[in-house]
């Protein structure tokens, strides 16, 4: 590693601080890769996959299972329908626009559940490549940024009450950070509702990841004999949720682990960004963004329509 790689080291250390957000880390890695400042001898793919798994496990300590189940009894039906509907719609739209299957599935999972965290969890289960992960994350991050500003404006224009807006934000916005940001801008009650529902929605990472491993093992197998690779870290993720619920006296420790996991996820996104380049993105074209935007518009409008009709 020579002097020209010093920017890589500096950027990596910077991603360990709270000053760098997930989207910024992805862009930072991409810029370094595009300018040839990433050490070519580093096994980025190996490091990324391991760190992603550990990050997801750590995030499990931030989910309060009992509270999420109790508060979301009224909204769980809508959550299930939107998750299943989004995954099914994603399959159909991908066929129509002829988008590569793995990338389309990652974007669908991110839209259906919880953005980058869902993509990170599903990716190892379906053996996604770094470029596919990066395209899915980039698509979700662009839409997240738009949602942060658009949703409160629409909410005020339609005079949505606090609970309705909080529910809508939790259902239709990808990442927890954008859900919290949009809901907090709308009101305190909206923030409480949105945060709790979002955590309940995040629980679906577990069954969706396991189902994904099974589906892709069958669908992509050579002569039907490809070995099924289960994302075992998901079981540890589930164990983390259960442990934090059974032993609430260690709440301060859990919050610390959760914070470290979130920062580790930022580092993951930086490493993923380091594995792509302008040439790779150009080869993908505009299809991923068009695909993600289509899914997002459908889930946003249908969930809002349902909430307006039933409130």
Swiss-Prot record:
Membrane-related topology note: Multi-pass membrane protein
Subcellular location: Cell membrane
Record bears the keyword Hydrolase: no
Keywords of the record: Cell membrane, Membrane, Transmembrane, Transmembrane helix
GO terms under cellular component: plasma membrane
Principal localisation: membrane
Signal peptide: none
Official protein name in the record: UPF0324 membrane protein VV1122
Organism: Vibrio vulnificus (strain YJ016)
Source organism phylogeny: Bacteria, Pseudomonadati, Pseudomonadota, Gammaproteobacteria, Vibrionales
């Amino acid at each position: 590693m020579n002097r020209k790689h010093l920017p890589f080291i500096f950027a990596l250390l910077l991603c360990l601080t709270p000053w760098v957000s997930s989207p910024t880390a992805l862009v930072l890695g991409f810029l370094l890769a595009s300018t040839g400042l990433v050490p070519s001898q580093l096994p980025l793919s190996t490091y990324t996959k391991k760190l992603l798994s550990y990050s997801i496990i750590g995030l499990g300590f931030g989910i309060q299972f009992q509270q999420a189940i109790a508060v979301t009894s009224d909204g769980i039906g809508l959550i299930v329908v939107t998750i299943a509907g989004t995954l099914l719609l994603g399959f159909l739209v991908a066929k129509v626009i002829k988008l590569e299957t793995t990338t389309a599935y990652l974007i669908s999972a991110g839209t259906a559940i919880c953005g980058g965290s869902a993509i990170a969890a599903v990716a190892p289960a379906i053996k996604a490549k770094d470029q596919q992960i990066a395209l899915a994350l980039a698509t979700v991050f662009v839409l997240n940024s738009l949602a942060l500003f658009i949703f409160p404006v629409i909410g005020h224009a339609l005079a949505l009450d606090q609970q309705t807006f909080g529910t809508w934000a939790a259902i239709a916005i990808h990442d927890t950070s954008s859900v919290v940001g949009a809901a907090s801008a709308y009101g305190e009650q909206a923030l409480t509702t949105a945060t709790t529902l979002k955590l309940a929605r995040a629980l679906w990472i577990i069954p969706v990841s396991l189902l994904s491993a099974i589906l892709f093992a069958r669908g992509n197998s050579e002569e039907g004999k490809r070995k099924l690779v289960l994302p075992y870290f998901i079981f540890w993720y589930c164990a983390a949720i259960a442990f934090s619920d059974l032993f609430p006296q260690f709440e301060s420790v859990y919050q610390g682990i959760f914070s470290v996991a979130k920062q580790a996820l930022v580092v993951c996104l930086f490493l993923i960004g380091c594995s792509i380049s302008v040439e790779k993105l150009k080869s993908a074209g505009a299809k991923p963004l068009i695909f993600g935007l289509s899914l997002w518009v459908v889930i946003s409008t249908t969930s809002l329509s349902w909430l307006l009709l039933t409130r």
